[in-house]
Amino acid sequence: MDKLTHINQQGDAHMVDVSDKKITTREATAMAIVSMKQSTLELILSSSNTKGDVLVIARIAGIYAAKKCWDLIPLCHPLMLSKIMVELTPNEKNATIEIKTLVKLDGKTGVEMEALTAASVTALTIYDMCKSVDRFIKIGEIQLLEKKGGKSGHWKLENV
């Protein structure tokens, strides 16, 4: 039977003890998609936003968010991340920006939450920087695409 790892036998929340786990290379990839009006995407791509270059600032916010995940999500471990990558791919046909994040470390616990947090905060930053010109921005499809390493091994979302 499956059980929640962050709940003890008494039903109390706790941070999982990873002290007996082996150090392995762990990697996670996540994504999000930000949909907007065509004119908003055109503003972003022309760097005409009065708040600055949206894609540069969103990428930096995503990197920072991965590093601060443990500060945002109470039961996450503070981790020494070795790689954080945030890719932003505008799709002019669909008026979207696809966000793909990759986080890596050599450690005792996975980095799925860091990759998901990076994707989420990148999307939220795009929203924040563009909300004055587009109230219809939508953030969606936040999901884990792949994870490698650790006891559970390699997992990949099919049809990606």
UniProtKB/Swiss-Prot annotation:
Alphabetized Gene3D superfamilies for the sequence: Molybdopterin cofactor biosynthesis C (MoaC) domain
Catalytic activity: (8S)-3',8-cyclo-7,8-dihydroguanosine 5'-triphosphate = cyclic pyranopterin phosphate + diphosphate
Keyword Lyase: yes
Pfam families: MoaC
Highest taxon listed in the record's lineage: Bacteria
HAMAP family (alphabetical): MoaC_B
Protein name: Cyclic pyranopterin monophosphate synthase
UniProt organism field: Ruthia magnifica subsp. Calyptogena magnifica
